[in-house]
Amino acid sequence: MKKLWLALAGMVLAFSASAADFSDGKQYATLDKPVPQSPQVLEFFSFYCPHCYQFAQVYHIPDAIQKALPADAKLTKYHVDFLGELGKELTQAWAVAIALGVEDKVSPLMFDAVQKTQTVKQPQDIRQVFVAAGVKAEDYDSALNSFVVKSLVAQQEKAAADLQLRGVPAVFVNGKYMIKSDGLDTSSMDNYVKQYADVVKFLLSQK
């Protein structure tokens, strides 16, 4: 657990910072080429990524971010297709989850199936995870190749390309800033999670 924590945090020296101390190049980076049409707060992840598992399932950073956001803001999550044998299929499946509004039900089960039990070996196994999450098999099947899902897949791929994504987990704000996890307070897990959410909230307020 300690090794995973250090890896996620970037293995940097601990320090504390208030919002006034947040600065470009430390806790966040300003993109050279902003993407104005990007969702307000956008997280990229992969069900194959061990750090993404820790990010979401152990430290619950996405939950902390969502709770810190103003009422009119939302955290959007996109899956990437460049990791793992079934990366493209899982990106398509995540589009199904978005279309059906079952992201929160599917995410923990899919992370466990891919990384813990390692029971996702073929596309049919992905379908079974959705069924275990309470989605009717016929609903999954009809959504899988729908226009809406195809559009969502293209949307995820385009966002990753436009933002020149290099790795996951990654969080972008207003298509202009990227959170730098190696510049956050690592004195404790709680401080790290809180500051991650605070930086996102701070960046949302920037013009």
UniProtKB/Swiss-Prot annotation:
Q: Enumerate the subcellular locations listed in this protein's record, separating them with semicolons.
A: Periplasm
Ranges for the Thioredoxin domain? Answer: 20-149
Enumerate the UniProt keywords alphabetically: Disulfide bond, Periplasm, Redox-active center, Signal
InterPro entries hit by this protein: DSBA-like_thioredoxin_dom, DsbA/DsbL, Thiol_disulfide_DsbA, Thioredoxin-like_sf, Thioredoxin_CS, Thioredoxin_domain
Origin: domain of life: Bacteria
**Which segment of the chain is annotated as a signal peptide?**
1-19
The family database entries (Pfam families) matched by this protein are listed as:
DSBA
Give this protein's Gene Ontology molecular function annotations.
disulfide oxidoreductase activity
Which Cys pairs are S-S linked? 49-52
Keyword Disulfide bond part of the UniProt annotation: yes
Physiological role: Required for disulfide bond formation in some periplasmic proteins such as PhoA or OmpA. Acts by transferring its disulfide bond to other proteins and is reduced in the process. DsbA is reoxidized by DsbB. It is required for pilus biogenesis.
Q: What is this protein called?
A: Thiol:disulfide interchange protein DsbA
> Which organism is the protein's source?
Dickeya dadantii (strain 3937) (Erwinia chrysanthemi (strain 3937))
